[in-house]
Amino acid sequence: MIVVKAGGRTLLNNMDEIVKSISRLEKAVFVHGGGDLVDEWERKMGMEPQFKVSASGIKFRYTDEKELEVFVAVLGGLLNKKIVASFASYGRGAVGLTGADGPSVIAERKKKVIVQEKVGERLVKRAIAGGYTGKIKEVKTDLIKALVERGLVPVVAPIALSPEGELLNVNGDQMAAELAKALSAEYLVLLTDVPGVLMDGKVVPEIKSSEAEEVAKKVGPGMNIKIIMAGRVASGGTKVVICDGTVPDPLKCLEERSGTWVVP
């Protein structure tokens, strides 16, 4: 079993190659982002996307009720079904779903979040309402396993369900990591728009899971959460690679051992 995750920018720029590469796998689950497309649709509707930075330096989309509606419609609907259609064009059956289906992914709605903001020259931390953002608490694998066993590729949008029945925006990298752990996946592949984790302009070939959180502090928003999640998954025995999703046949990184590998 291989779990693959691609962020929105990477996916939108190279969907055919990513889907074609996954289509060759016997057993695969695909988790997708799509924030850029959400931003585009929000602006069409006269809304401005909201982003915050957590106290730990993780950039995230702040999701109020109106933004949640667009997020679910675009990621759980339009983009998700475009990906399913792309799989069909390569002769591979796929089923589009979210973590709310089943339900497969249960998350706790964040009541408050601590964010950091620049006020003049100072970095100030303050608490704000959590909106419709969730932290994953439980993964139920029955539905996803059943689809995989039938030779289908589950295409999962990063939307979870709260115990109270609320739809929640969850981080796509966390969604992929939690699914990989729950499914005891052999590999978790995080496709991004750079060749791997970069330091001083060079790809870091390997990171130990015990060092992941420290390394994450040295890289920018977007990559830091990938490294943190990769470290947590790798510590459980799943092989994790962060590699270039913009190239032809991006999953060749598994054979070539390219990109950045996160190891126990």
From Swiss-Prot:
Signal peptide: none annotated. The record marks K5, K226 as: Transition state stabilizer. Substrate binds at G34, G35, R61, N169. One of its GO terms (cellular component) is cytoplasm. It is found in: Cytoplasm. This is Putative [LysW]-aminoadipate/[LysW]-glutamate kinase. Its EC number is 2.7.2.17, 2.7.2.19. It catalyses: [amino-group carrier protein]-C-terminal-N-(1,4-dicarboxybutan-1-yl)-L-glutamine + ATP = [amino-group carrier protein]-C-terminal-N-(1-carboxy-5-phosphooxy-5-oxopentan-1-yl)-L-glutamine + ADP; [amino-group carrier protein]-C-terminal-gamma-(L-glutamyl)-L-glutamate + ATP = [amino-group carrier protein]-C-terminal-gamma-(5-phospho-L-glutamyl)-L-glutamate + ADP. It comes from Ignicoccus hospitalis (strain KIN4/I / DSM 18386 / JCM 14125). Belongs to the acetylglutamate kinase family. LysZ subfamily. Involved in both the arginine and lysine biosynthetic pathways. Phosphorylates the LysW-bound precursors glutamate (for arginine biosynthesis), respectively alpha-aminoadipate (for lysine biosynthesis). Pathway: Amino-acid biosynthesis; L-lysine biosynthesis via AAA pathway; L-lysine from L-alpha-aminoadipate (Thermus route): step 2/5; Amino-acid biosynthesis; L-arginine biosynthesis. NCBIfam families: argB (TIGR00761), PRK14058.1-4 (NF010662). GO terms for biological process: arginine biosynthetic process via ornithine; L-arginine biosynthetic process; lysine biosynthetic process via aminoadipic acid.
